[in-house]
Amino acid sequence: MDTPDDLYYTDDHEWLRVENGTATVGITDFAQSELGDIVFVELEPEGTKLGQDDIFGTVEAVKTVSELYMPVGGTITAINTELELSPEVVNEDPYGDGWMIEIELAAPDEAEELMGADAYAEVT
């Protein structure tokens, strides 16, 4: 499994990339491989304010639906609209083109509470 060192990770298999007070969120390579072929992604709209661990969307695979949880609190500033037409991109490139939302961080320190790559690799 691919686990980039520059990201933060959650027990629920979301990743977070922090840059200049904003963050990009998606699901991990482990999560997409466990889900199988992703056929639909539904995300909360831009402007939605959510707390840490709140649900920001769902991912539907061939045999299951999984909720997506906010790794940190914040306001959604962008959603990956490409996933509406091509949800399989999450399977193909979970850390790149398969990103899901961008957020403005409510409390940047929350990211420090998440796992680094080594800790995440131990739980997967």
From Swiss-Prot:
GO biological process: glycine decarboxylation via glycine cleavage system
Keywords, sorted A to Z: Lipoyl
Positions of post-translational N6-lipoyllysine modification: K63
GO CC annotations, alphabetized: cytoplasm; glycine cleavage complex
Domain of life: Bacteria
Classification via PROSITE patterns: BIOTINYL_LIPOYL, LIPOYL
SUPFAM superfamilies assigned to the protein according to its UniProt record, in alphabetical order: Single hybrid motif
Cofactor details (free text): Binds 1 lipoyl cofactor covalently.
Domain Lipoyl-binding: 22-104
Needed cofactors: (R)-lipoate
Function: The glycine cleavage system catalyzes the degradation of glycine. The H protein shuttles the methylamine group of glycine from the P protein to the T protein.
Assembly, per entry: The glycine cleavage system is composed of four proteins: P, T, L and H.
PANTHER family: GLYCINE CLEAVAGE SYSTEM H PROTEIN (PTHR11715), GLYCINE CLEAVAGE SYSTEM H PROTEIN-RELATED (PTHR11715:SF3)
Entry's family note: Belongs to the GcvH family.
Annotated protein name in UniProt: Glycine cleavage system H protein
